[in-house]
């Protein structure tokens, strides 16, 4: 349930063109009996990804930082003083971005993240190391935040099996659980952002969101690789 990326920084850093470019292309040599071809291709792509390079330069925990930055640049979801819950927070990027934009501090934390994977401490973020699917997780999140959230964000994705439909169904299930949580805790006027995969089985989820929010649509930020089936569902203006 860990997040595929990390974030931090001001509300309008990075942006669509912020990844930069490099003429240096890294090739990963194949050694017989050591590296699977698929793993070699992934590593080579990762090493040559401009968002990966920029995330290191900017101090973000991973390239997915730019996904939230780009979505926020377009839709202005994050605002000073908001309270945020981050589901599937590892390695901490989205919590990092949220904390900086809303002005969360250790003295007055306004961001709570949860993941069963360990997340290194982040300024202004309360981190719960537990599975969001555990029965007690929702209440622990609310107790830690101390108020209803203005925004619930989720970059959760089930571990991939290599079977596209299976991966899609498992991730959609996480989306549904996250959506059920969001509609049970959000403040009126709040927003919900969640990762999903293309696959055409989200009808029930979309129906729920359209019933509960005034605006629902898919978003694919530039930082999401073009060849990836990854999408984000953005539901805005919770009816309460």
Swiss-Prot record:
Q: List the disulfide bonds.
A: none
Where is this chain primarily localised?
A: cytoplasm
Catalytic residues (UniProt): 195
Q: What domain of life does the UniProt record list for this protein's source?
A: Bacteria
Q: Which reaction does it catalyse?
A: uridine(2552) in 23S rRNA + S-adenosyl-L-methionine = 2'-O-methyluridine(2552) in 23S rRNA + S-adenosyl-L-homocysteine + H(+)
Q: Where does the record place it?
A: Cytoplasm
Spell out the residue ranges making up region: Disordered.
1-40
Sorted alphabetically, which Pfam families does this protein's record hold? FtsJ (PF01728)
Keyword S-adenosyl-L-methionine: yes or no? yes
**Gene Ontology terms, MF aspect:** rRNA (uridine-2'-O-)-methyltransferase activity
Q: Which UniProt keywords apply?
A: Cytoplasm, Methyltransferase, rRNA processing, S-adenosyl-L-methionine, Transferase
Q: Which GO terms describe its cellular component?
A: cytoplasm
Recorded hits in Gene3D superfamilies, A to Z, give: Vaccinia Virus protein VP39 (3.40.50.150)
What the protein does comes down to:
Specifically methylates the uridine in position 2552 of 23S rRNA at the 2'-O position of the ribose in the fully assembled 50S ribosomal subunit.
Can you tell me which family this protein belongs to?
Belongs to the class I-like SAM-binding methyltransferase superfamily. RNA methyltransferase RlmE family.
Database matches in PANTHER family: RIBOSOMAL RNA METHYLTRANSFERASE (PTHR10920), RRNA METHYLTRANSFERASE 2, MITOCHONDRIAL (PTHR10920:SF18)
Please give the name of this protein: Ribosomal RNA large subunit methyltransferase E
């Amino acid at each position: 349930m860990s997040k595929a990326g990390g974030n931090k920084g001001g509300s309008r850093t990075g942006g669509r063109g912020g990844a930069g470019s490099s003429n240096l292309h890294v090739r990963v040599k194949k050694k017989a009996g050591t590296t699977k071809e698929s793993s070699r291709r992934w590593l080579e792509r990762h090493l040559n990804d401009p968002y990966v390079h920029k995330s290191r330069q900017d101090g973000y925990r991973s390239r997915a930082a730019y996904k939230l930055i780009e979505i926020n640049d377009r839709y202005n979801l994050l605002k000073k003083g908001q309270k945020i819950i981050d589901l599937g927070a590892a390695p901490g990027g989205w919590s990092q971005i949220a904390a900086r934009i809303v002005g969360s501090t250790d003295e007055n934390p306004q961001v709570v993240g949860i993941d069963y994977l360990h997340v290194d401490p982040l300024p202004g973020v309360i981190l719960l190391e537990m599975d969001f699917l555990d029965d007690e997780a929702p209440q622990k999140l609310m107790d830690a935040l101390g108020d209803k959230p203005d925004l619930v964000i989720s970059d959760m994705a089930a571990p991939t099996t290599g079977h596209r439909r299976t991966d899609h169904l498992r991730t959609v299930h996480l989306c549904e659980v996250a959506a059920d949580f969001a509609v049970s805790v959000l403040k009126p006027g709040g927003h919900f952002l969640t990762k999903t995969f293309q696959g055409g089985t989200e009808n029930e989820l979309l129906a729920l969101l359209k019933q509960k929010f005034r605006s629902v649509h898919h978003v694919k930020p530039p930082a999401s690789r073009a060849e990836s089936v990854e999408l984000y569902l953005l539901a805005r203006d919770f009816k309460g």
